């Protein structure tokens, strides 16, 4: 009786990996070994960039808030300090959204921050 090798299991595993590697260039989509290496790297990049995305968005919001503040004669750090003194708790995401979509409301917040500064 011949020895049973991992025929079905291996084929399933290889098909799964190659299916995930569809669209990759050259051997990276055809060779199991290359596909597995590439998928491993892709997973690492995806993990790192999920963390990175949070930092990138925060930076974008701060840039937008700063630009809008400077139109009203205030810089970002003074504005945030004024908001904290005034007891206004709005996160940076919403502040950036207000600065872009509702400039009048943002101007009101800037005035309140200025007033709280003294």
Swiss-Prot record:
Keywords: Ribonucleoprotein, Ribosomal protein, RNA-binding, rRNA-binding. One of its GO terms (molecular function) is structural constituent of ribosome. It comes from the Bacteria. InterPro entries: Ribosomal_bL20, RIBOSOMAL_L20_CS, Ribosomal_protein_bL20_C. GO terms for cellular component: ribonucleoprotein complex; ribosome. GO terms for biological process: ribosomal large subunit assembly; translation. CDD domains: Ribosomal_L20. It holds the Pfam family Ribosomal_L20. Belongs to the bacterial ribosomal protein bL20 family. Binds directly to 23S ribosomal RNA and is necessary for the in vitro assembly process of the 50S ribosomal subunit. It is not involved in the protein synthesizing functions of that subunit. HAMAP family: Ribosomal_bL20 (MF_00382). This is Large ribosomal subunit protein bL20. It comes from Thermus thermophilus (strain ATCC 27634 / DSM 579 / HB8). The gene is rplT.
